[in-house]
């Protein structure tokens, strides 16, 4: 069985076990009889056996999604706006120009071209202030990356910092700041207090008159931690205020919580580490164009057409109780293939030479089955979800949508 079909079959079986007859509309007519038989047999079993069967189905699904157990997201889990916007761009829900207004979001074409998984990480809440000169402020941040699977190869990583516009006077030349990003090379306990051994990863000169997100390349550090298994002592962020004092330190670049502002504001504006990786399965992320409304064609000719073709099948994640950890989409149109493969096979039935021969033999020998109506082309979907560690993940899953059917 094609992996995509097996995936859908398990979903449908889970829906039947969880919801009974209320989900019968999701099952093709030809399968309702078999589903009823399954339910009849299941009704005679002990409830413990049914729950065990359901757990097996769920475990199979989670394995397909690359998860070791079912995520149980906490109420404090935060979905960064950046990841939501990235999902919308990746899935083609909205154009980049519409999404980027006021957010500074640009689709990461180069990192995404080598990845099928994007993960986001917030730093551990405790911050370590690093004493510096009167013109700068610096902090050390720790990011726990232990939730990245062993089979996922990280290709790049970026650190996103939010900076707000600050009115410091009319003098343009006095409004420049330099933001330096360092990798901490040794644990603070082994160093002189107030001094870190670091290496520079990225730097940028910015002006205080703009509110936007800044993105810094921290790939060398993250690759050392994940590929080379080197110790992770965190990143150091230094903001140097050129030609000025520290009057507005902490107001321009959001690297620490501001007490007067609400926790919700800080949750969305705090520093964000984003990794791009590939687990070796399927294609890389590719930004899709915005979807247009489908054109409606007359269905009169199809009502009597029983030949092999694609039919609608919507899979709703809430029906299997997964809408608490799958952020988007709420469901998707999977489609399925059903219909006859009559002799002689028409060109539009997308048949193989073998299917043509098999159908020809069937016409004179009924003991040989007809060719079957099966998916001939499958496509991927993007999913945004919370994993077992409350980390937000954007991932491409292959062979989830039927694009074409044929007799094979």
Curated annotation (Swiss-Prot):
Compositional bias of kind Basic residues? 284-307
Q: Which UniProt keywords apply?
A: Chondrogenesis, Cleavage on pair of basic residues, Cytokine, Developmental protein, Differentiation, Disulfide bond, Extracellular matrix, Glycoprotein, Growth factor, Osteogenesis, Phosphoprotein, Secreted, Signal
- What biological process terms from GO does the record include? ameloblast differentiation; anatomical structure formation involved in morphogenesis; angiogenesis; anterior/posterior axis specification; aortic valve morphogenesis; blood vessel development; blood vessel endothelial cell proliferation involved in sprouting angiogenesis; BMP signaling pathway
What is a GO molecular function of this protein? co-receptor binding
- According to its UniProt record, what is one Pfam family this protein matches? TGF_beta
Which is a Gene Ontology cellular component entry for this protein?
extracellular space
Subcellular location, record wording:
Secreted, Extracellular space, Extracellular matrix
Q: In which tissues is it expressed?
A: In the cochlea, detected in nonprosensory regions and outer sulcus (at protein level). Prior to gastrulation, expressed in the extraembryonic ectoderm. Later, expressed in the extraembryonic mesoderm.
- Gene3D superfamilies, per the entry: 2.60.120.970, Cystine-knot cytokines
User: Where is the secretion signal located?
Assistant: 1-19
Q: What is its main location?
A: secreted
The disruption phenotype is: Homozygous null embryos contain no primordial germ cells. They also lack an allantois, an extraembryonic mesodermal tissue derived from precursors in the proximal epiblast. Mandibular molar tooth germs arrest in the bud stage. Failure to form the primary enamel knot in the mandibular molar tooth buds at 13.5 dpc. Significantly reduces the expression of Lef1 and Axin2 in the maxillary molar tooth germs and mandibular molar buds at 13.5 dpc. Expression of Dkk2 and Sfrp2 expanded into the distal tooth mesenchyme in molar mandibular tooth buds at 13.5 dpc.
InterPro entries associated with the record:
BMP4_TGF_beta-like (IPR047833), Cystine-knot_cytokine (IPR029034), TGF-b_C (IPR001839), TGF-b_propeptide (IPR001111), TGF-beta-rel (IPR015615), TGFb_CS (IPR017948)
What is known about what this protein does? Growth factor of the TGF-beta superfamily that plays essential roles in many developmental processes, including neurogenesis, vascular development, angiogenesis and osteogenesis. Acts in concert with PTHLH/PTHRP to stimulate ductal outgrowth during embryonic mammary development and to inhibit hair follicle induction. Initiates the canonical BMP signaling cascade by associating with type I receptor BMPR1A and type II receptor BMPR2. Once all three components are bound together in a complex at the cell surface, BMPR2 phosphorylates and activates BMPR1A.
Family assignment? Belongs to the TGF-beta family.
Official protein name in the record: Bone morphogenetic protein 4
Q: Which organism is it from?
A: Mus musculus
Q: What gene does this protein come from? A: Bmp4
């Amino acid at each position: 069985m094609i992996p995509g079909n097996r995936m859908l079959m398990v979903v449908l079986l889970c829906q039947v076990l969880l919801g009974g007859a209320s989900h019968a509309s999701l099952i093709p007519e030809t399968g309702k009889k078999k589903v009823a038989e399954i339910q009849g047999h299941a009704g005679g079993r002990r409830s413990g056996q049914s729950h065990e069967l359901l757990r097996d189905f769920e475990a199979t699904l989670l394995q397909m999604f690359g998860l070791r157990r079912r995520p149980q997201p906490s109420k404090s889990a935060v979905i960064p706006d950046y990841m939501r916007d990235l999902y919308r761009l990746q899935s083609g829900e909205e154009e980049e120009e519409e999404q980027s207004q006021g957010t500074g979001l640009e689709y990461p074409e180069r990192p995404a071209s080598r990845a099928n998984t994007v993960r986001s990480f917030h730093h551990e809440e405790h911050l370590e202030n690093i004493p510096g000169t009167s013109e700068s402020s610096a902090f050390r941040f720790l990011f726990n990356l232990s939730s990245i699977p062993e089979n996922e190869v990280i290709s790049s990583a970026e650190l996103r910092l939010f900076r707000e516009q600050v009115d410091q006077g009319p003098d343009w030349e006095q409004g420049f700041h330099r933001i330096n990003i360092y990798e901490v090379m040794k644990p603070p306990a082994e160093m002189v207090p107030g001094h870190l051994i670091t290496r520079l990863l990225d730097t940028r000169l910015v002006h205080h008159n703009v509110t936007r997100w800044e993105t810094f390349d921290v790939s060398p550090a993250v690759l050392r931690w994940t590929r080379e298994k080197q110790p992770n002592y965190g990143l150091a962020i230094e903001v140097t205020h050129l030609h000025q004092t520290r009057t507005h330190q902490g107001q321009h670049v959001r690297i620490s919580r501001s007490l007067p502002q609400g926790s919700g504001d800080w949750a969305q504006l705090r520093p964000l580490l984003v990794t791009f990786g590939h687990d070796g399965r399927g294609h890389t992320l590719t930004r899709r164009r915005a979807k247009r409304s489908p054109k409606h064609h007359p269905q009169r000719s199809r009502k009597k057409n029983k030949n092999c073709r694609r039919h609608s099948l919507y899979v709703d994640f809430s029906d299997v109780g997964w809408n608490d950890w799958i952020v988007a989409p709420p469901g998707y149109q999977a489609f399925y293939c059903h219909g006859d493969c009559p002799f002689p096979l028409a060109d539009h039935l997308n048949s193989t030479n073998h299917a043509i021969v098999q159908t020809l033999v069937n016409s004179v020998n009924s003991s040989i089955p007809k060719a079957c109506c099966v998916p001939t082309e499958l496509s991927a979907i993007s999913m945004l979800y919370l994993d077992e560690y409350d980390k937000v993940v954007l991932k491409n899953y292959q062979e989830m949508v039927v694009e074409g059917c044929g007799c094979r």
